[in-house]
From Swiss-Prot:
This is Lipopolysaccharide core heptose(II)-phosphate phosphatase. Pathway: Bacterial outer membrane biogenesis; lipopolysaccharide metabolism. One of its GO terms (cellular component) is periplasmic space. The gene is ais. InterPro entries: His_Pase_superF_clade-1 (IPR013078), His_PPase_superfam (IPR029033), LipoPS_heptP_Pase (IPR011310). Belongs to the phosphoglycerate mutase family. Ais subfamily.
Length: 200
């Protein structure tokens, strides 16, 4: 019972910290909460969260070539030239606050290309489990985090994965655009959704 109370207090303390950081972020140019009910976590807030514990950030891939009139980078199942530029811009902004992270993607051309342009040369590990978007993705996240418990993780995956996680963890309706993301963390073997990443 005592252990449970301590765990509960720790979780409440973390949630209060998250709310405070979100409120601080909300004093800037955007609201602290998205219309879907998820806390909005910008680059600076994410950097502060990462000082509390390692974070796991999941991004949808960049602009998909076969669903756009923009010029393709190469393979039609991959991303557009505009998508590469957007991914690189996002990566530069992200790395300014979190320079050290392990990088993963699902085994599709569009996620691999997005991660490659995002990272600007960082080692990428492709994991086919990140294409599966039920409870399997939680097992994959916990496994990746267990390999390097003190490292931040960036994962490039798909819109239906992000939609599933938001609904499952917070009963939120999340319809991610290209390169939209979610912020999570793993604590004592459980995966928690902290909020929606916003690039500001």
């Amino acid at each position: 019972m005592l252990a449970f109370c301590r765990s509960s207090l720790k979780s409440k303390k973390y949630f209060i910290i998250l709310l405070a950081l979100a409120a601080i972020a909300g004093l800037g140019t955007h609201a602290a909460w998205s219309s879907n009910g998820l806390p909005r976590i910008d680059n600076k807030t994410l950097g502060r969260l990462a000082q509390q514990h390692p974070v796991v950030v999941l991004f949808r891939h960049a602009e998909h070539c076969d669903r756009s009139t923009n010029q393709c980078l190469s393979d039609k199942t991959g991303i557009t030239v505009k998508g590469t530029q957007d991914a690189r811009e996002l990566g530069n902004a992200f790395s300014a606050d979190i320079p050290d992270f392990d990088l993963y993607s699902s085994n599709t051309v569009r996620t691999i290309q997005s991660a490659t342009w995002f990272s600007a040369g960082k080692k990428l590990t492709v994991d086919k489990r990140l294409l599966q978007c039920g409870n399997e993705i939680y097992s994959a996240i916990k496994d990746l985090q267990s390999k390097a418990p003190d490292k931040n993780i960036v994962i490039f995956t798909h819109n239906h994965c992000l939609t599933y996680i938001a609904k499952d963890k917070r009963d939120a309706t999340f319809k991610p655009d290209y390169l939209d993301g979610l912020v999570m963390h793993v604590e004592k073997g459980k995966v928690y959704l902290d909020g929606e990443f916003v690039n500001h």
